[in-house]
From Swiss-Prot:
Pfam families: PNP_UDP_1 (PF01048). Homohexamer. Dimer of a homotrimer. GO terms for cellular component: cytosol. Keywords: Glycosyltransferase, Purine salvage, Transferase. It is an enzyme of class 2 (transferase). It comes from the Archaea. CDD domains: MTAP_SsMTAPII_like_MTIP. This is Probable 6-oxopurine nucleoside phosphorylase. Although this enzyme belongs to the family of MTA phosphorylases based on sequence homology, it has been shown that conserved amino acid substitutions in the substrate binding pocket convert the substrate specificity of this enzyme from 6-aminopurines to 6-oxopurines. Pathway: Purine metabolism; purine nucleoside salvage. It catalyses: a purine D-ribonucleoside + phosphate = a purine nucleobase + alpha-D-ribose 1-phosphate; guanosine + phosphate = alpha-D-ribose 1-phosphate + guanine; inosine + phosphate = alpha-D-ribose 1-phosphate + hypoxanthine. GO terms for molecular function: guanosine phosphorylase activity; S-methyl-5-thioadenosine phosphorylase activity.
Amino acid sequence: MPRIAIIGGSGVYDPALLTNIREETVETPYGTVKVKIGEYNGEEIVFLARHGEGHSVPPHKINYRANIWALYELGVERILSTSAVGSLNLDMKPGDFVILDQLMDFTKTRHYTFYDGEESPHDRKFVAHVDFTEPYCPELRKALMNAARELGFTYHPMGTYACMEGPRFETRAEIRALKILGADVVGMTQCPEAALARELEMCYASVAIVTNYAAGISPNKLTHTEVVELMAQKSNEIKLLLMKAIEYIPKERRCPCKDALKGATGE
């Protein structure tokens, strides 16, 4: 049973560096999910392409609940994800890695919880209010930082991610407002993904890859082409970072993530 999963974002569509890869289809209360399962250092790892193969699903149409539930069904306890981001912080340059520690949610139309009371399409028919003070698992963040340090990659140990609805890029005014609010980087996929993982008491962390400066900071027109091109340039480093981080993940979970539902239902 795999205990670790990788969710690949924009530009990360294949489980390279894994061996003995097989495809599986997982049925969930929220829909069907296709994943790939392979091995790394003798351990099974699940790979899920967030946008589908070839970036076929836009951020606001991703079935986040099905994706996270599918990983849970497979027995996954820890999730490492990647996110392509625009930078609002001049110190975070294109090509840099950012080990996210905080996020802000500005999405509008997504499904944010598994716990819809009696309307839940599974036997967990209750309402839960999980603590999200620290949205990213400290153990997984530490593993990513240790890996980046060992590999000699340029990385930032902290960063606040602003999640926008998309699929369009942001306006100059939006970026100015986000900067005032304290955002370092901006993207479209961390919400509700990170919160859903917490609701199922799974550990979750994300490494953001800066692909460009955000609107009004960059003097150029923003294009998805530049995102794809930079992610292609960083592709090998991203995969090396994720695999090395897996080596640093402790076997036993000692983080608060595993007890996220304690006290969340009022019982």
